[in-house]
UniProtKB/Swiss-Prot annotation:
The keyword tRNA processing does not apply. It comes from the Bacteria. Keywords: Methylation, Ribonucleoprotein, Ribosomal protein, RNA-binding, rRNA-binding. This is Large ribosomal subunit protein uL11. It holds the Pfam family Ribosomal_L11. PROSITE patterns: RIBOSOMAL_L11. It comes from Cupriavidus necator (strain ATCC 17699 / DSM 428 / KCTC 22496 / NCIMB 10442 / H16 / Stanier 337) (Ralstonia eutropha). GO terms for cellular component: cytosolic large ribosomal subunit. GO terms for biological process: translation. Forms part of the ribosomal stalk which helps the ribosome interact with GTP-bound translation factors. Belongs to the universal ribosomal protein uL11 family.
Length: 143
């Protein structure tokens, strides 16, 4: 018989930097989960990633105080800012442009995010990424 699920916890944690301090500790502690066990497992799985890159994770908590977790790809906005070489988007995205990315860069981001996007094909995924970039004040060349 399957274990009884008591809840899901969604967090964004920097790769390789999970520790018992907030937000990880309080979120897992409320459900009675082993915080250090999660931190060690998460840090081991994100070892090959760029340190500090925020990684969304969904933790499934079970009634017997065990858990499983699924990592998603980093947020598109973080990947877009990294590709454009900026630290934050424009406060007025439709009037003030703060950077630009090429279609090739948008395709690379779309391939990285493909598992998490609901796009039917790569071209639709690229258009989704381009829309996110435009809403941040970043122009997409070649689109």
């Amino acid at each position: 018989m399957a274990k009884k699920i008591i809840g899901f916890i969604k967090l964004q944690i920097p790769a390789g930097k999970a520790n018992p301090s907030p937000p990880v500790g309080p979120a897992l502690g409320q459900r009675g989960l082993n915080i250090m066990e999660f931190c060690k497992a998460f840090n081991a799985q994100t070892q090959g990633m760029e340190p500090g890159l925020p990684v969304p994770v969904v933790i499934t908590a079970f009634a017997d105080k065990s858990f499983t977790f699924v990592m998603k790809s980093p947020p598109a906005t973080v990947l877009i800012k990294k590709a454009a070489g900026i630290t934050k988007g424009s406060p007025k995205p439709h009037t003030d442009k703060v950077g630009k990315i090429t279609r090739a860069q948008a395709e690379e981001i779309a391939k990285a995010k493909n598992a998490d996007l609901t796009a039917a094909d790569l071209d639709a995924a690229v258009r989704t990424i381009a829309g996110s970039a435009r809403s941040m004040g970043i122009t997409v060349e070649g689109l």
